[in-house]
From Swiss-Prot:
The keyword Metal-binding applies. This is Nitrogen fixation protein NifU. Binds 1 [2Fe-2S] cluster per subunit. Belongs to the NifU family. It comes from Trichormus azollae. Its cofactor is [2Fe-2S] cluster. PANTHER family: IRON-SULFUR CLUSTER ASSEMBLY ENZYME NIFU HOMOLOG. Residues 201-220 are annotated as: Disordered. One of its GO terms (biological process) is nitrogen fixation. CDD domains: IscU_like, NifU_Fer2_BFD-like. Pfam families: Fer2_BFD, NifU, NifU_N. It comes from the Bacteria.
Amino acid sequence: MWDYTDKVLELFYDPKNQGVIEDNGEPGVKVATGEVGSIACGDALRLHIKVEVESDKIVDSRFQTFGCTSAIASSSALTEMIKGLTLDEALKVSNKDIADYLGGLPEAKMHCSVMGQEALEAAIYNYRGIPLATHDDEDEGALVCTCFGVSENKVRRIVIENDLTSAEQVTNYIKAGGGCGSCLAKIDDIIKDVKENKAATNLNNKGGSKPTNIPNSGQKRPLTNVQKIALIQKVLDEEVRPVLIADGGDVELYDVDGDIVKVVLQGACGSCSSSTATLKIAIESRLRDRINPSLVVEAV
């Protein structure tokens, strides 16, 4: 049995705002609906919003859902959260916000909060008269999961927004990979690519903000081995290690043999599937840029 919070159970047994908002032609307001999921896949959500046209605020919201305890609770929570928000404010509500409002969801049920976020977005764009295909480029990417019709762009977005690290987590959030399983290797590749890009971005944003001051005599004399080791250690300490430590990892200089720099990856870096990217992007490229373009970094 799933371990649900008291808030989840409360909104499951006594859901708030369940039902339909009828468009009765009330002056000054407009009703819109967003739908996601499908009954065939086991989860479907229809979200209704009533918007005050002049202020662009959501004055009422209700839902209809076909799904489990988490689906009902997530939908009910969302309708409570968005009342009184402008449409632009509501668009900022994430699936994490929905889960936090509920005090957390079992990871295998996180896709219910994702459905809520997507239904809200669909309702708002329907209200604004913008076809979903126009604003949502996720379906333009290559199809990764044929069982649930999930594109590469959607997998990539959900990995980035929720900091996911495994294909199993992706399945829990958007069901991709939960059918025949043939796409799990592709999902792993996407996660790896996201990690590599994140490592490069973190290094540029953090490590590159204050370059190490490398003394320059103006003469192109080769560095002695002692000088080279000292400079490598300086760059590692000042530019590389702070970035890795912030992500739960670290690096230690082990040896320098000519242009071969041997290091020991520690903490999260040592067990991370993207350790090769860490070596090449976060360490080797920085040492080449700061000291010598012929340096090669190897892990021991």
